[in-house]
């Protein structure tokens, strides 16, 4: 180690960069310091496209047979002769022609076509080429009429000949297929759905038999051809927009070419596009003797278009030459675009005298379209333009943003004419290349950049990369101008770079996107292995990408790991899950979500979630650096679940209810704006939900009929949905970091000086010399932007610290009503809002006075005391001797529970105060004290202390608020100070306190104190939102109704006592655990620290006099009181001559995450900023167990160093939940034991390994989970039973490839799954010490184990897990651990400096006596004591 350190500082030696481990480490990281095979990042070898050559050669031979069966004319010999007219006749037998005379008599056929369309000029040439060639390529510019007219030309010719024809035309988008079909019907005056119709997804117009011209999406035709395995169902197949080269189109080209040569030689194929690469497509469909003919049609431009490149604009002074090799926009790039804007404006001003058009008119039709690669660049460009235009007031502009996430209102702004005298500048992404046409655009500024999504098939991580746009993209962008007048295009690159460096076409989707659906289609095609089919693509993927995709499909259960029982690296037999997945237009993991939803009888919910995950921008996006109030609405929809997917489900349910209530359009739009919902996306999602329901029905996935089994209630559904999500998106698992650090909770409280971390945030960079107590109100006002009222918080300072602490008040006023917004765990909603506020803007300006002025200000107004130049602000003097809080020397207290909110909050009156309370009550109810009736409602204000009727007597109360107005008579909500309960009372049940009474009792602390149950918290299995279940509260109420109770005080923190309630038959806390209404829990650091202090004081009590005990207790209580916010009036702003910047607010609970996958160990992780988990806080800071987050998808940065989790769900804080889910849903796993085989300590999950070499099949996706709770053989048996039942749900998969289990069998299986899952999650698991080793990622040879029974053999998607039997603990080991434990207790009362001790039970080092004492109080150590049989003397 020392030599390594010296080498680091030896600058004569070469410095080597290394990769730091960033993944999920649980336990001692020192165990990983030795380098091993597993400690290095995985780099899988990439295999290119050499495999293609042999397969393509065979396909060419098949294509050459196409010549033998066709009449070939005007064939082109070489690529250079594509336009030649050489003819070659090859007379062969013609196909039989089917007459369709009756059909043409049935419908009206007007054969007069629109001659004004440019395509009409090539009509005869097009038809001649189609008659004489199997494949024709038609290149026609946008707007020439090819999409609507060419199919009609074919239909007209068939009509003339009275021949049968059946034409199908593909469109890449649904809306295009529908609108074009309707347009053709309108043009021909056909009833929609007769001669011409459309099909999108499963939705097809009714009269199928009469349809002769079908417009459909690419996927519809592809699925039909895979099912039919022939083209002969159609006479003509027209593939439109083939240049887009998405995966469906590329795979469709494979299928069409293969079937055309194989069994459909007489079918005609027409390829159409505005920007088609004619050479590539001609080569793809070429035979040995000819190439398909190319017919070109153009429409001619009405107004001229001039293009300029950066190096051609000599009059503009460029500050620097761009680094064109690396795509991107620097500060100078934005400035250069603004220079062009100024040049455009000056040019139009000077042209006024030379043109008939005025300057104002020129601005109206001279809108500027600036193409930028993304939303961040749009915001940056807008900022630059705004700042420059402020210096040029003569140029008045309107900036409009245009991107896919904009609201409908913003979309309308793009098309609206600019205000009089304004020039419209549209900042857009590539959405305006083809989807949007704005007529008044005359100028385009093109940065020639785009963002393209690439997916690493080995990791399944996606990355949005900034790249140079293709020339095709740039030409499409240029085509946006010149609609109303001549146009100009300014490309922000040099002409040489554009011509020589930029690519002609973009990268096809098949080379950069996941291949799962293409591989599944290749399997369904049944014409060879996936690699043999995909090798035939126009741009075949790398073999390693196919291999990785096969591995991913095996992981999700779409493919078996074997082919006919033998492992295949590049192939696997199609499972019934894979067949179902191939029928859904979804990512395979969303399809898996639906399948598991069917298994666990939550089909409707998962269909909605899957539909919502396919729709982009369900929520609207606000502008940068603006706290988007509507963002908080995401949390309302998530309803405390911590799940983006649950939020989607709830949004849809509300929308559906509104639709059923027939809400007016205006009301729906108002609701959508209020809740930040994109109504257009919601409607699109609704259509997808309907389609997915149809697709589920088509593969026999149906919900169980109501009444056939017990349905999930809302509480159960909140857990089962998360179980399904964990199963669907395995292995996108992430674990919160730092929880296992023994020092975690101590540093947590130290950072906020003992405040409650669940209610406290803090600012930094506040210098104490600025006398912060003067500005508490101003600091509170900072939170108004997130709608937190100033009265709901206290602002405090620590002497000498630069931190400002903001503690939010518990919502006592609403504790009997449900909150509008729920957040997970114990943390207050306001903390989430505060942290979200910082994420939008980290620096907060605050106006203050300089120190000398501030000192004069407080002295003049006698605020506090100034001593030797130091200000001491006013403070509350605590009369701690009057507090009713339990003494530090009191262990047990007897008394009454006065009011119960829940097991986590109730109020207790000590028996010792009974006489004084009775005396107070007698005073309050004397005639003289009750004489002050409330005559005027205005006299009752919030916070006023008065007397209010409680039962038959009046008691002290404080006014919370005016509650209701009933018949003009106000009612007031009050809280009884000495009992804790609340009531809503009319004025006649209130009395004002006389002056003398107020003087005597106004400052008297409450005659009760707040309590909560210690060492337990609500069970996540039986409660939601960390609330105590009703059954638990009812148990506490029944105990309290028995009269006097005995409380054992565990600790006192922030004036709240953590207690154990003793009953005749035990302790209530334990009984709640036994009934699964609660679970055992650690107390937090402050509670354990106080408990340790109380134990030591109580042990020493016999040696301390009563008077000394009182003095010590007063000192204890005084020290326990936190600083109070005095809420001083701030100085006037005109006296505040300085501005400082606070940083924050921060929360000590902010968490980071680590990937649990091996491939993600070396990467940092963030959560998508629009997720409900974007503010990820430690919801249960006292709990040291890991809590898991599951992501629907994961993207990575271009440098692959950082991952972003999207569509996240926070899993329930059930101990061991992550390990149990991995065991339940992984393809296979090995659970490993400690060296003595007495307990399971970790599990290795993944796709499995080669039994001969022990090398993993898919090392990147192997996952290690170190166990922190006990997992037993019984748990593995339960999991195996559940895996068997999931497989059984699809047993007897028949020839129709549909699950054929009957309803009765399904009900039996579902009830078994329900029972097993409840058993698995409901166990109270004891804690175990952490284990980490260097061999965790090594698959072990377990051939000595008897293999488990496999009911479905190698046809099981979820094979049975095997595991070693556990041994009993060795007696000598137990004795050693007991001796170690006794030694720790012996050191507990040591007063000197302690040498480092090791707790061998928990594998933790203890550096001090204080640390040792607190460790002995942890749940982990107490559980370990029980496990080793140690009993404290």
Swiss-Prot record:
Region (Disordered): 76-98
Protein EC: 3.6.4.13
GO CC field: nucleus; P granule
Helicase ATP-binding domain: residues covered: 127-294
InterPro entries documented for this protein: DEAD/DEAH_box_helicase_dom, Helicase-assoc_dom, Helicase_ATP-bd, Helicase_C-like, P-loop_NTPase, SNase_OB-fold_sf, Tudor, Znf_C2H2_type
Keyword Cytoplasm attached: yes
Domain Helicase C-terminal: 354-526
Catalytic activity: ATP + H2O = ADP + phosphate + H(+)
Entry annotated with the keyword Transmembrane helix: no
Gene3D superfamilies (alphabetical): 1.20.120.1080, 2.30.30.140, 2.40.50.90, P-loop containing nucleotide triphosphate hydrolases
Binding site for ATP: 140-147
Keywords, sorted A to Z: ATP-binding, Cytoplasm, Developmental protein, Differentiation, Helicase, Hydrolase, Meiosis, Nucleotide-binding, Oogenesis, RNA-mediated gene silencing, Spermatogenesis
GO terms for MF: ATP binding; ATP hydrolysis activity; RNA binding; RNA helicase activity
Position of sequence motif DEAH box: 240-243
Function: Probable ATP-binding RNA helicase which plays a central role during spermatogenesis and oogenesis by repressing transposable elements and preventing their mobilization, which is essential for the germline integrity. Acts via the piRNA metabolic process, which mediates the repression of transposable elements during meiosis by forming complexes composed of piRNAs and Piwi and govern the methylation and subsequent repression of transposons. Involved in the repression of LTR retrotransposon copia.
Protein family per UniProt: Belongs to the DEAD box helicase family. DEAH subfamily.
Protein's recorded name: Probable ATP-dependent RNA helicase spindle-E
